[in-house]
């Protein structure tokens, strides 16, 4: 009976139906009880194949062996076995049916987690555990010999050892194997410890240098940012001033139309009284392109047409007029006013 109760502790109940076979009374021997369990498993397999619906019957009715005569012929009463393993359940029918089709070994007791934990391990597992422990101990010993246990145990150096290592680092940041062994023997340390100290010292030096470079770059960046902002303000001010100047003072018109010899000084002899010389000087000084009309002024044309007074004929009124009023040429300024538009001085002045 203990075997049957242990099988009933399984949390996965299944629905079982049995074929119309004679019901065995549980008071018989153990072999017959095993036969009753096998018949129940086979009946469950047939129930999955036929998909027949059954009803349950109490274990007391199964033990008494009562049969309902009102049922149609060919249908057998459904018995719920006394084992909780075969209690019907609609929710877990598929999973339990799969387990039943695989079959159960009724002669073996199901494994229990607590019992397994309490059992003594086999000799092979004990040997493997001891082997793993030995390997771990060997690795720990190797790390301790090579100085690799720094993460678990920090190296403590005296002041003399630290100062000597600092002086050695200032001389040589890296050590050769011979220097490393000599330094380790002198300081009563292992070569691995000396090597690790130098590695850490180089890392700290590099980190400090990186921090210094970072601060320097930050200052340079801030200075360049301020300079860039100042230049942008100056550019904005210059652009505003250029717009104001362009709108207030339009460009002068006609400066590119000035004669090419505007800066040249023209001087005429004051004792010259010949009108031809005056007309020639006027024609040489001013090109016809100065005037927008394209033609020479009427005064210059008339002056060019006046005959010379030294030709023997009496001077006419126009000749007397030009002879009395001799033009006076002086230096031209930047903004030159044509002499034809300037008031000519009198002869008495």
UniProtKB/Swiss-Prot annotation:
Residue spans binding DNA? 150-209
User: For this UniProt entry, what is the primary localization, expressed as one broad class?
Assistant: nucleus
Q: Where is this region: Leucine-zipper?
A: 208-252
UniProt-annotated stretches for the region Disordered: 42-186
GO CC annotations, alphabetized: nucleus
Q: Which controlled-vocabulary keywords does the entry list?
A: DNA-binding, Homeobox, Nucleus, Transcription, Transcription regulation
Is Protein transport given among the entry's keywords?
Answer: no
| UniProt-listed InterPro entries | HD, HD-ZIP_Homeobox_LZ_Class_II, Homeobox_CS, Homeodomain-like_sf, Leu_zip_homeo
- Origin superkingdom: Eukaryota
Reported tissue expression: Expressed in seedlings, roots, leaves, nodes, internodes, flowers and embryo.
Listed GO MF terms: DNA-binding transcription factor activity, RNA polymerase II-specific; sequence-specific DNA binding
Output the CDD domains linked to this UniProt entry.
homeodomain
Residue ranges annotated as compositionally biased, kind Basic and acidic residues, are 167-183
Q: Where is the composition biased (Polar residues)?
A: 89-99, 121-135
Subcellular locations according to the entry? Nucleus
Q: How does it assemble?
A: Homodimer. May form a heterodimer with HOX1, HOX2 or HOX3.
PANTHER family, A to Z: HOMEOBOX-LEUCINE ZIPPER PROTEIN HAT14, HOMEOBOX-LEUCINE ZIPPER PROTEIN HOX7
Q: What does this protein do?
A: Probable transcription factor that binds to the DNA sequence 5'-CAAT[GC]ATTG-3'.
Give the UniProt family note.
Belongs to the HD-ZIP homeobox family. Class II subfamily.
The protein in question is named: Homeobox-leucine zipper protein HOX7
What organism, scientifically named, is this protein from? Answer: Oryza sativa subsp. indica
């Amino acid at each position: 009976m203990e075997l049957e109760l242990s099988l009933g502790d399984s949390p996965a109940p299944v629905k079982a139906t049995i074929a119309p076979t004679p019901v065995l009374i549980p008071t018989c021997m153990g072999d017959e009880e095993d036969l009753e369990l096998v018949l129940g498993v086979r009946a469950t397999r047939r129930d999955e194949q036929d998909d027949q619906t059954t009803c349950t019957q109490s274990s007391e009715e199964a033990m008494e062996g009562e049969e309902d005569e009102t049922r149609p012929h060919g249908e057998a009463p459904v018995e719920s076995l006394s084992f909780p393993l075969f209690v019907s359940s609609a929710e877990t029918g598929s999973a339990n049916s799969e387990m039943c089709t695989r079959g159960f070994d009724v002669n073996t007791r199901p494994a229990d987690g607590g019992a397994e934990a309490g059992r003594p391990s086999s000799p092979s597992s004990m040997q493997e555990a001891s082997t793993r422990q030995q390997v771990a101990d060997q690795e720990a010993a190797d790390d301790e010999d090579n100085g690799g246990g720094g993460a678990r145990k920090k190296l403590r150096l005296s002041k003399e050892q630290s100062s000597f290592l600092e002086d050695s680092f200032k001389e040589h940041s890296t050590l050769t194997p011979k220097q490393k062994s000599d330094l380790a023997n002198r300081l009563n340390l292992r070569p691995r410890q000396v090597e690790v100290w130098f590695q850490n010292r180089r890392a700290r030096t590099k980190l400090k240098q990186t921090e210094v470079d970072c601060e320097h770059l930050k200052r340079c960046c801030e200075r360049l940012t301020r300079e860039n902002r100042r230049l942008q303000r100056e550019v904005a001010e210059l652009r505003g001033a250029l717009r104001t100047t362009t709108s207030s003072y339009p460009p002068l018109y006609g400066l590119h139309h000035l004669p090419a010899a505007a800066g040249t000084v023209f001087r005429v002899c004051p004792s010259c009284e010949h009108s031809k010389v005056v007309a020639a000087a006027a024609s040489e000084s001013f090109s016809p392109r100065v005037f927008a009309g394209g033609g020479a002024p009427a005064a210059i044309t008339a002056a060019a047409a006046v005959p010379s007074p030294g030709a023997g004929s009496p001077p006419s009124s126009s000749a007397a007029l030009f002879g009395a009023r001799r033009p006076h040429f002086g230096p031209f300024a930047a903004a030159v006013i044509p002499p034809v538009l300037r008031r000519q001085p009198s002869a008495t002045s």
